């Protein structure tokens, strides 16, 4: 079965920011409103996915604005410092827009950045001050926007070790742990049902690799 879901992107981050600005400027239009509501629903489904999520930010990635929400929804994120040996693409960047600060709340009612910097207004303000800037790996790691930043010497090995490590665990047994980490802070009726109850009833208490005779939680 599937244990880990890896997110990658490819494109022009400046173009993504331009689309974000367009949607914001036209947010009262029915089509722009529907697009944003659809993205809101899709991102919530990512939040509630019962598998380990990892984002890989490499040269050529376009994790900016709305697409950067995918990085913030993941359990871990890895960003390459500089370029791959022999590569000719510019170094990876992450960029923020207003879309990261309100339009796409999680099931618990706060943004993914508010969840990441829970009750840490200073860090959240520092991140907000960088809206519109193309942040390289060192800057993103320093701000706390990614889990790890590695150069090309360690890159392949670190990604491989993480994927092998995560796949060696019971993906269903990890669901509760990951739900607790993803949904810190306030509880809403939505998060109580879909982030808590569903995780335990539909995955942990039902799945053979979690609670079966040889399941991870019965060893």
Regions found by a protein language model. Name each.
Residues 1-54, 58-70, 77-86, 128-142, ...:
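C-terminal alpha-helix plus adjacent terminal tail
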Residues 64-127:
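CoA-thioester-processing core
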Residues 118, 151-152:
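Helix-capping/helix-break motifs at membrane-protein junctions
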């Amino acid at each position: 079965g599937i244990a880990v879901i890896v997110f990658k992107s490819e494109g022009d981050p400046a173009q993504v920011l331009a689309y974000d600005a367009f949607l914001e400027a036209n947010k009262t239009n029915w089509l722009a409103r529907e697009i944003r509501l659809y993205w809101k629903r899709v991102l919530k489904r990512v939040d509630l996915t019962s598998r380990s999520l990892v984002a890989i930010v490499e040269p050529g990635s376009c994790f900016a604005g709305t697409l950067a929400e995918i990085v913030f929804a993941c359990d871990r994120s890895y960003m390459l410092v500089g370029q791959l040996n022999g590569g000719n693409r510019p170094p990876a960047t992450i960029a923020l827009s207003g879309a990261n600060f309100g339009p796409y709340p999680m099931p618990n009612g706060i943004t993914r950045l508010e969840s990441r910097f829970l009750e840490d207004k200073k860090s959240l303000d520092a991140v907000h001050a960088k809206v519109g800037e193309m942040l390289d790996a060192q800057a993103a790691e320093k701000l706390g926007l990614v889990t790890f930043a590695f150069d090309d010497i360690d890159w392949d090995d670190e990604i491989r070790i993480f994927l092998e490590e995560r796949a060696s665990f019971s993906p269903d047994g990890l669901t509760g742990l990951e739900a607790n980490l993803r949904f810190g802070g306030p509880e809403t009726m939505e998060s109580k049902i879909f982030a808590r109850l569903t995780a335990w009833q539909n995955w942990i208490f039902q799945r053979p690799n979690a609670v079966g005779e040889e399941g991870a939680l019965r060893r």
